[in-house]
Structure formats: structure tokens, C-alpha cells
């Protein structure tokens, strides 16, 4: 699989970009602060439906666009080994505020081949692996960093894995909550 086309509208520092990509190695080069990392972030967002860098996804909406119509659109078209195309489209917007005391409502819509999909079903439609300087913590950091990295990779490859992982995390949260209640004397051990 390779990404054959990328469209970005109001994403980070990009107002409107259309890129056609060829199979094989692609190198993006340029001066600092020109958007190379932003371009890679957009590709990663298409693969995993969430940003690798933004703590708040509202931050990916281009600042100038946020003043007018606060939205961003990223579309990626990938060509699979069997020559079938897959298109992932992610639209993010901030709805207008109801009054001056509230922030706008953030909305994210994901489509795969034109059909609306929840994030868990869109993960892996376009496969990507991002390795950055921050990922050195995979070597120096705790095992939880390595587990999370492997979870991200496996979620793209195996659709059932992400469902099982989500269920496992839910069960672990319930277990931890129950253990806390037992420790506090608010629940019995049976």
C-alpha cells in the first residue's frame, strides 16, 4: 500500500494543498518551520484518526481559518497491493459558539470510501508508521511506552485487535475501580 494522493485544507500551516505521490521513497525537505512535520502529522492522522502531536485536536485547524470558518479537511487516497483504492477523509470543525462564555463545539467526521465510520473502524484503512525523536522513549522509557506503540501498530493490521484492546482496557478500568472501592471499604470482596 502507498499513499497516492493527499489533500489538506486548513491543516496547521497549510491553507490548501494537493499532493500526488509516487510509489517508493518520498523525501520531504525544506527549511525549519515550513510544514514538513505537519505534513507527516496529516498522514498519521489519516492512518490512526488522531493526531500524533496535538493534545487538543482543535489545534490542527489552521489559525487563520479559525478566525473565519474553523474547520480542516484531510483526504488521503492509498493504492493497495491489489490495485484497489481506499480513500479516508477526516473533517474537523468547531461549531459556532452559542454565546460569548462558551467555546465552540468540536466535531470530527470520518469517512472511508465515502461511508461514515467510527474511528475504530477507520484505523488501518491507510497504514502508516511514524517514528520521531520523541519515540526514543521506546528504548529509554518504561515498558508501557513499548506496549502502546505495539498496540498502535497492531491496531492498523488487525481489525479485531483494536476491538479486543478496547474491551480489555474497559475491563481493566472496571477492575481497578472495584479494587479501589474494596480498599476504601465501599465494596465487598465477593
Question: PLM ranges: what are they?
Answer:
Residues 23, 34, 38, 55, ...:
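Generic alpha-helix structural propensity
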Amino acid at each position: 500500500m502507498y499513499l497516492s494522493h493527499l489533500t489538506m485544507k486548513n491543516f496547521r500551516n497549510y491553507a490548501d494543498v494537493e499532493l500526488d505521490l509516487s510509489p517508493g521513497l518520498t523525501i520531504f525537505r525544506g527549511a525549519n518551520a515550513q510544514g514538513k512535520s505537519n505534513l507527516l502529522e496529516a498522514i498519521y492522522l489519516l492512518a490512526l484518526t488522531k493526531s500524533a502531536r496535538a493534545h487538543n485536536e482543535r489545534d490542527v485547524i489552521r489559525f487563520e481559518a479559525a478566525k473565519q470558518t474553523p474547520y480542516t479537511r484531510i483526504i488521503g487516497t492509498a493504492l493497495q497491493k491489489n490495485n484497489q483504492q481506499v480513500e479516508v477523509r477526516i473533517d474537523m470543525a468547531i461549531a459556532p459558539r452559542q454565546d460569548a462564555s462558551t467555546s465552540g463545539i468540536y466535531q470530527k467526521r470520518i469517512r472511508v470510501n465515502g461511508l461514515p465510520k467510527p474511528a475504530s473502524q477507520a484505523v488501518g484503512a491507510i497504514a502508516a508508521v511514524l517514528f520521531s525523536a520523541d519515540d526514543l522513549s521506546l528504548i529509554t522509557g518504561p515498558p508501557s511506552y513499548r506496549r502502546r506503540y505495539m498496540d498502535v501498530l497492531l491496531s492498523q493490521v488487525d481489525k479485531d485487535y483494536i476491538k479486543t484492546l478496547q474491551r480489555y482496557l474497559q475491563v481493566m478500568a472496571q477492575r481497578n475501580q472495584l479494587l479501589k472501592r474494596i480498599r476504601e471499604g465501599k465494596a465487598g470482596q465477593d
